[in-house]
Amino acid sequence: DGKTIDQMSIQRIEHIIESLKNETYQPKPAKRVYIPKKNGGNRPLGIPSFEDKLVQEVARMILEAIYEGHFESTSHGFRPYKSCHTALTHIQHQFTGTRWFIEGDIKGFFDNINHNILIDTLRERISDERFLRLVRKFLNAGYVDNWKYNRTYSGTPQGGIISPILANIYLDKFDKYINEYIERFNKGEKKRRNAVYFQKNTQAVNLRKKLKVETDPCVKAELTEKAKKLQIEMRNIPCSHDMDENYRRMKYVRYADDFIIGVIGSKVDCEKIKADITKYMSDVLNLELSAEKTLITHAQDTAKFLGYELSVRKSYAMKRN
């Protein structure tokens, strides 16, 4: 807009405050720029004017004070003390024993946020209609691309200071829906024990007892060799049954518009979860999950999340893509 931070003065700040009070403040269209994506395309960013950045930062601080304490712990994007690393650590610690991954992909999320749904969601916690009208002004401000003005009817511009927290507020409903879904889905206290493993374990305990009291070197060497072989056998035998129809678990983590679900259960369970969350996204949030990119992947193969490949062997292995 031709104005810089160096030109900021008390008078200019007072003018902004007054225009906010009497609701004459009108955000300027964001300047659209493009940055290259890894897949070869371009990602559009909307760069606000300096005054709009200033007002948006104040609005962001207000929204954060209202909402941060109510967000779910499974949300890791654009939040204080959370990051890609905390999301991956969450997976490493919480997704133990996962048999299937569901990779979530929301089609054009930032461009398709429904303004009316977002404002109604904000209204559930914010009673100040003047503040809500200001947020709507930012949503409707539009953008300038190649000197041409374009109005925005949906979405929140990537590059806007309040866009990340508005995105989290929008998807917080989904986070809470998933947590309720998990409570209904989970079943059983623990997996059914594998009788073969515990039979071998009993043999190992008895061998160790014999070794403690045995004095004959030849017999002791023979018992030691048996114990070693038994230990090797036990490494390849699970202590519980992988497929226990009376035991199910579901885990979830989200970073911005990327999410992944871990399931201990059957592929049929995963297909139902995918169908249910697709319907919720469409019916409640007016968003579309990509049928091609929302994948169900066996945990022994690799699922992608935040640029990492996730798989389950005897322990989690995460390697940089």
Predicted segments, located by residue:
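Non-catalytic terminal/accessory segments
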Residues: 1-321
